[in-house]
């Protein structure tokens, strides 16, 4: 798809919403009489707030407060379903098994499901609105997941190009596993304290560290959204430099805003860093000026 059509999709998605096919995700089922008590003691959210038909964003942490897995959690009958990044299947299954001690809990790996996510007005108006689904926010706005099969009417819906979905994710400063999120991250560094953590609940692994960070009120780096003028030469892994040439951060995700041509990048910046900021185009050697967006997520 050419950039003009991508730009049209992006503009429409901002104002009206849209639908896109979810990539393969890890899906785990927890069942058994102790499933609630066990899971409630492992995650960063208060599971008593879980509403039928809605998903809750949460984290599983290491005892040192670092991110083991970002999750979406919801109920399916008496069971709990956990969704996370497919890349961490082995590590997450091992982590869940490790903390089961004489509990009536079964952990089952679910088969992949073909799911279309609709968000914005498109999710709640028109041809897709009368179909049941799971209410969940995936792009920072209300949305609904709906499973699809051959012949399903949702298959006839015009789906957003994956490049447009990625552009929406980046402009909303939403971190993704493998780009911004990894096993060395403290959740507040990526703003997950605002969406994935309840501070008024009981203990879980890593809770003491997270509470201490909240009481101190700061971490050593934060995720920011940077903006550059139209042009190439920016890419994940590229250093972001301060005026004196010192490295202040590294880009983790980069996308062109197809409607304006501007380039957006997510970057962890060291605490206290201010503009001006720049990066060097490795092909031309030219300096690319960067500004911190007012819409930066943290």
At which residue positions do the language-model features occur?
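Glycine-rich, small/acidic residue-mixed loop/short-helix segments
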Residues: 71, 168, 185, 191-197, ...
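Acidic, proline/glycine-enriched N-terminal capping motif
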Residues: 1-57, 61-68
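Short, conserved charged micro-motifs
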Residues: 34-39, 89-93, 122-125, 150-156, ...
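Residue-level signal for inorganic ion chemistry
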Residues: 32, 82, 120, 206, ...
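Short amphipathic beta-strand starts and helix->beta connectors
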Residues: 6-15, 58-70, 100-101, 125-134, ...
